[in-house]
Amino acid sequence: MKKNEQKVVFLDRDGVINKEVGYLHHIKDFKFIDGVFSACQYFQKNGYFIIIVTNQSGIARGYYQEEDFHVLTKWMVKEFSNNSIDILDVFFCPHGPESTCNCRKPNPGMLLDAKEKYNIDMNNSWMIGDKEADVGAANSAGINNTILVKTGHNIDESHSQAKFILKSIKETIGIIK
């Protein structure tokens, strides 16, 4: 690690932090996945900052407004705070799958923006997601420590580039050190 570089656990949102419900934008539909708070407390105790990186194509598709996303995000970050967890930042891509933007995973834009903003040591950071796009974005950004969790989308384990495939985020305790 270079001087003043931070190590980070990057988390996808839907399917990692909360149960996947498809275009989530109402607080009433948000259900935290069991073990997410204890895992995040563990990451912090081990010197990691936590950043959320999430594709939100529901904005581009017109299913909800960007303001709806911000209201839900503010509430979610407060819930983390109520559990003694500091979320350093939340990066999101509002574009649809057909977009040529660099921020939509599997492109690395959100991770690279975070690296620049917070001087992150990508070699000692981790990405936890529920889709191969999360792994692709991480690898393209120089993060080789990747975990896919089975609490979101189905994972083709035989073709995955993830370093670990686990049942849920709570199984990351002990793996991330």
Could you tell me what each predicted segment is?
Residues 163-171:
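Short acidic-hydrophobic, aromatic-tinged amphipathic segments that line or gate anion-handling sites
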Residues 127-164:
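Acidic, Mg2+-coordinating phosphoryl-transfer loop and its flanking beta/alpha structural elements
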